[in-house]
Amino acid sequence: RDRMNKIRLVVASLLLGAATGFAQKPFNASGTGNPIIPGYFADPTVKKFGDTYYMYATTDGSGAGFGPAQVWTSKDFVNWTLMPMNWPDSHWIWAPDVMKHTDGNYYYFYCQPCMIHCGVSETPRGPWKNILGESEAVLVPDRFVTNAITLDGQTFVDDDGSVYLYWGTWGIYKGFGCGAGKLASDMKSFTETRLIPNTEATDFFEAPFVMKRKGIYYFMYSSGSCHDHTYRVQYATSDKPMGPYTYRGCILETNTDGTIHGPGHHSVLKEGNEYYMVYHRHDNPHSNRGFHRQLCVDRMEFAEDGSIKSLIPTHDGIGALASSVVKSKNLALGAKVRASSFYDAGFRPEYAVDDNNGTLWLSLIHI
């Protein structure tokens, strides 16, 4: 009997290890699917317009979202091309989002502390012009909704075509929360606004994202500190887009070995009947205070009652969502590499040719 109990314990441990990602590739393995793209980016919104995926994100650049306006495009969700955008022509472009309206136009929302701007275009990559006329005109000023600090604007389009905008950061204080508004048909004003308080969205910090599935509205958001391992994704549900909402729990957090560190500020891509969460995590090895972030994606799953199952963040990602557009072979993969120096063991020369967007080589002296 003792021997059988030991066998059951071993089998259970193996199953648990598989379920929690115990057997996954390490973060620095060759050919990982996460991060999705090379470089340091954050706050991703991924949309599919026609047969093309568009990924809009904060560009960390030298750190903490300093970069300009740009967009990544892909036909297969594996091979991406970086494209600049004309507007705005400044830096510090945070948490961008683009949506297609029933009027056929595309609307581009981006943030600068602490305000939200909106541009309009006939294509999802511009050229953009401010919907209010002047280039720096502000759609949502700070505290437009009382006790909602204006940042991280994100749109949701309901089944009837109604457009909602959600925003907020530092919503942890008593009486604070997330701003929400129903946009007028001209997209220049609001017909209804509300504060979604942190009593409904427990520990709401920032980065709201709303989606609808089978009649349930899911209000997802990030909690904790964006600088450390406490950053995570939680959610609440309602039968109305503006709430009131009921808190449901945490669905994405730092993994057990810390190599997926501080995952959060996400969006959701729906592809057929499948849902994918696209989010950022801190770089590996972790830099100071999480100012260099990387974009990842993992599959979402739902229980029979509509609740979101806890995501198991991976280094594998999801792979291609369409036939690959790149037919040529990666000739550099696995090649022997030498360098005059390297910074430390976390930045070895072979990382330059390992087909892993999360690793890189740095010389001992680098800028």
Regions found by a protein language model. Give the residues of each.
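Aromatic-lined glycan-binding groove of carbohydrate-active enzymes
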Residues: 209
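Signature of short aromatic-glycine-proline-rich micro-motifs recurring in repeat-based ectodomains
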Residues: 264-267
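Bacterial N-terminal signal peptides
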Residues: 10-18
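Bacterial N-terminal signal peptides that target proteins for export
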Residues: 2-11
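Beta-rich carbohydrate-recognition and catalytic domains
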Residues: 24-202, 212-258, 273-275, 280-325
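Disordered, acidic Ser/Thr/Pro-rich linker "stalks" and the adjacent N-terminal cap
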Residues: 319-365
